[in-house]
Each structure stands twice: as structure tokens, then as C-alpha cells.
């Protein structure tokens, strides 16, 4: 088996609301920077091309999955897998909060956010259609990645289903703002608990990409990080726009999953029967 390591990166940036051309230019610059560092996988935050609080202006930000602007980003670094956040239009008036996997100069896959939060200061269920399928993409031989977008990771069943497919990586693009759920719910502390728990539980490296900066009254606190398969922090962003990177190793993943075989011992048939009884 080819057990060559995978150099990965996470971009922490502050997208400008509805400024697609400016955001595309910023993405291109970060992709070139990552390419110069010989990274093979690069993750941007949720809705990185559009900004977050789109509301009734969501249609202005939308593009189809085969949009030439996405393809132009893919062509910058054809030997790198790049994951960017965008609003996908699938039919007139129907939109998804989505990410595109850019690979070999093409759009290799699109994942659509399933769990749309509509509580606190979050209103995604008003503007987007929920996705219905999980997606797994091969970044290079023996390295596959699954993506769950932000609130997807607050539905444990979605994480479990994604991990039953045994990806080597879990990608977590988010748009997390301070106190947007409530004053008592600390996004900063709770996201740290969330991603480190899943990394440790499933023996999976987690790449978390959050924004940093203001959008209207919202403050996106950053905290982007790369976690190893035991929940350890391999790289963490400072309080600014930046690129962080780490090198991941298949042997470390195998050792973590051998020590704690959560996926091997999942007993999916029993869980399915119990779900059918509930």
C-alpha cells in the first residue's frame, strides 16, 4: 500500500459579503500560496466565496456547480484538491449551502449541507434546501475525505454515517460567529470540544476552517485548526487571516483506529434495528 503522507492546509479568511469577484481573487491568491508550499489538500471555510448572512439576497450569490468561475479556481493548482464554499443554484429559486471539490482542473464533486440551523441568530432553513447525500472524494491514492458543513457536525448521526464509509479525513468548513446561538452557548469552547471529540472517537484527522473578522454585527472568531487522529492539535490559526498546514500520516491513523476501533465495532445492523424501533 502507498502510505505516503498528505500535506494539508486550511485557509482562515474573512470573505466579503456578496463580493464574489473580490473573494474569487482572494481564493486564487491563497491557492497559489498553498501550491508554493507543496500542499495537496486545501480547505476554505463555509460559504467562503459569498459571505454568510445573505438572506433575501441569496440568489445574487448563487452559481451552478459547473460555473466557469469555479473551474478557473480548479485550474490554478490541478495537482491539489481544493474545497471551497459557495451557494449552489440547482433550479430557479432553489439553492444549497454547498462546497465544491476542485481537483485536476475540474469540479470533482459537490456536497450540500444537510443540517440547516434555524435557531438563535441562524436562519439557513429560510433560504436553502437541505442536502440529502453524503459525499466522499479521493484526494490521492489511499486518502479519501468526507465533508460535513458546520451544523452538520452538531448532528452526531450524520458524523457517524460519514465515518462508517471509513474516510481517512473529515473536513469541517464552518461559519461560526460568537454568541450567534445564544450568549450562554460558547461557539469558541464548544467547537473545540466538538472537533477534538470526533477526531479522537473515530481516529480521524479533522480539518476545521472558520472565518475571522466581522460581517455586519456578527464576529467570526477564527480558531481554525488541524487535528490529528487522537484529537491532538497539529496546527491552529492565530487571530488573523492566514494559512495553516500540517502533514498527515496513514500509519498514525491506523494506529489510532486499532487502539480504539469505534468504526470496526459500530455494529451497524443492531443500530439500524434500534432506530427502526424508535
PLM features per residue range, with description:
Residues 1-41:
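N-terminal glycine-/serine-/threonine-rich phosphate-binding loop
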Residues 20, 29-110, 176-197, 201-204:
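Cys-nucleophile CN-hydrolase/nitrilase-fold catalytic domain and related Cys-dependent amidase chemistry
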Residues 65-68, 90-174, 179, 183-193, ...:
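Active-site catalytic loop in hydrolytic enzyme cores
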Residues 253-278:
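A conserved C-terminal secondary-structure "cap"
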Residues 65-83, 154-244:
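CN hydrolase (nitrilase-like) catalytic-core segments centered on the catalytic cysteine
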Residues 3, 10, 25, 35, ...:
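RNA-binding accessory domains that recognize and position tRNA/RNA substrates
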Residues 82-86, 113-122, 206-210:
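Short Pro/Gly-enriched beta-strand edge/turn motifs at strand-loop
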Residues 84-86, 97-101, 135-137, 224-226, ...:
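Short beta-strand scaffold segments in enzyme catalytic cores
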Amino acid at each position: 500500500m502507498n502510505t505516503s503522507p498528505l500535506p494539508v492546509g486550511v485557509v482562515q479568511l474573512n470573505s466579503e459579503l456578496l463580493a464574489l469577484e473580490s473573494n474569487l481573487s482572494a481564493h486564487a491568491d491563497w491557492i497559489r500560496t498553498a501550491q508554493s508550499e507543496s500542499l495537496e489538500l486545501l480547505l476554505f471555510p463555509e460559504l467562503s466565496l459569498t459571505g454568510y448572512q445573505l438572506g433575501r439576497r441569496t440568489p445574487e450569490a448563487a452559481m451552478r456547480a459547473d460555473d466557469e468561475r469555479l473551474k478557473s479556481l480548479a485550474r490554478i493548482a490541478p495537482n491539489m484538491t481544493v474545497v471551497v464554499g459557495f451557494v449552489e443554484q440547482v433550479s430557479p429559486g432553489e439553492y444549497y449551502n454547498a462546497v465544491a471539490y476542485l481537483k485536476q482542473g475540474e469540479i470533482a464533486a459537490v456536497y450540500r449541507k444537510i443540517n440547516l440551523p434555524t435557531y438563535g441568530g441562524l436562519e439557513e432553513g429560510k433560504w436553502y434546501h437541505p442536502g440529502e447525500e453524503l459525499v466522499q472524494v479521493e484526494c490521492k491514492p489511499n486518502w479519501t475525505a468526507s465533508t460535513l458543513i458546520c451544523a452538520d457536525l452538531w448532528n452526531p448521526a450524520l458524523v457517524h454515517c460519514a465515518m462508517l464509509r471509513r474516510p481517512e479525513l473529515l473536513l469541517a468548513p464552518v461559519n461560526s460567529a460568537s454568541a450567534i446561538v445564544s450568549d450562554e452557548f460558547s461557539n469558541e469552547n464548544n467547537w473545540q470540544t466538538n472537533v477534538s471529540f470526533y477526531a479522537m472517537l473515530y481516529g480521524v484527522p479533522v480539518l476545521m476552517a472558520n472565518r475571522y473578522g466581522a460581517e455586519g454585527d456578527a464576529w467570526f472568531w477564527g480558531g481554525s485548526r488541524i487535528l490529528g487522529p487522537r484529537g491532538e492539535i497539529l496546527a491552529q490559526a492565530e487571530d488573523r487571516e492566514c494559512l495553516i498546514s500540517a502533514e498527515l500520516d496513514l500509519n498514525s491513523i491506523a494506529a489510532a483506529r486499532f487502539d480504539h476501533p469505534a468504526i470496526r465495532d459500530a455494529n451497524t445492523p443492531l443500530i439500524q434495528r434500534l432506530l427502526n424501533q424508535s
